[in-house]
Amino acid sequence: MPSLKEVQLKIKGVKQTKKITKAMNMVATSKLRGAQTNMEAFRPYAEKFAEVLGSLAAKAGEETSPLLVPKESVKRVNVVLCTSDRGLCGGFNTNLVRMANAYLKRCQEKEIEVSFTHFGKKGRDWCRKMTDCERKSEYLGVVGARFGFNVAVTAGRELINGFLNGDYDEVHVIYSEFQGMAKQLPVIRQLLPIPPIETADSPASDGGEDYLAEHICEPSPDEILDAMLPKNVFIQIYSALLETSTSEHAARMAAMDNASKACNDMINELTLLYNKARQAAITAELMDIVGGAEALKG
């Protein structure tokens, strides 16, 4: 059985750890509110933008933008991998890296070259360890922090230029979709060429939920579409970053809450062990006293 001093030191150490996990839980909770507010505020804009873009795509002529045209054969793919810069958030980064690794293996089986654009240190560090993983660009200090739309514009322009120049035939993004405080789902979506945008077959005339507005285009649908397609890429990247940031804070909040609970359980176990050790020490002292008294009598 460990000594009383050893148990006391262990209890003190666990209590210090609990203070840290509790503080990190509170910080993550605070950041989560802000990130979730930004994400939910941006969703209606992204949905309306997709609606207008789909309407324009349906009206556009036969001369289609190169951002919409799939390549005849896919030989090179770029993947935008969104992870966090820091750990201590449970399996958040592990799930994203696992999806990226699975996608990399599928592409290698088809003899497709894969390169990565990184948001976050965890994804970048994983790619550094892979001998067959080419890194294009990296953006650190973005996910989980305060960032503006200009970050998505910078990354989006680089991806669009690479796609138009033939550096890669497709661009995909892997990010964490926020589905609730206890559920963050890693997903992969195609950015380029821009996949077909679903629109309602026929606009409803009653103005209900399925109502699709008739968009009047000036100067022409083709010209407006050419201007909106790059912005659609920026919006998809920005939305992925918002979702990933919110998911990171939610995952860290849950991980630190579980860690604090584990600290409480450990403190209870160590306290019980301390009481047993203390009781054993007191019993031993009493036995010595009684033994000494009996020896004096004898």
From Swiss-Prot:
Renumbered to this chain, the signal peptide range is none
Query: Which UniProt keywords are listed?
Result: ATP synthesis, Cell inner membrane, Cell membrane, CF(1), Hydrogen ion transport, Ion transport, Membrane, Transport
Entry's localization field: Cell inner membrane
Say yes or no: keyword Translocase present: no
Looking up PROSITE patterns in the UniProt record yields: ATPASE_GAMMA
Q: In the record, what terms sit under GO molecular function?
A: ATP binding; proton-transporting ATP synthase activity, rotational mechanism
GO biological-process terms attached to the record: proton motive force-driven plasma membrane ATP synthesis
> The organism sits in which domain of life?
Bacteria
Q: Which InterPro entries match?
A: ATP_synth_F1_ATPase_gsu (IPR035968), ATP_synth_F1_gsu (IPR000131), ATP_synth_F1_gsu_CS (IPR023632)
- Summary of the function given for this chain in its UniProt record: Produces ATP from ADP in the presence of a proton gradient across the membrane. The gamma chain is believed to be important in regulating ATPase activity and the flow of protons through the CF(0) complex.
In which family does this protein belong, per the annotation? Belongs to the ATPase gamma chain family.
Q: What is this protein called?
A: ATP synthase gamma chain
Identify the species of origin.
Answer: Desulfosudis oleivorans (strain DSM 6200 / JCM 39069 / Hxd3)
Organism lineage string: Bacteria, Pseudomonadati, Thermodesulfobacteriota, Desulfobacteria, Desulfobacterales
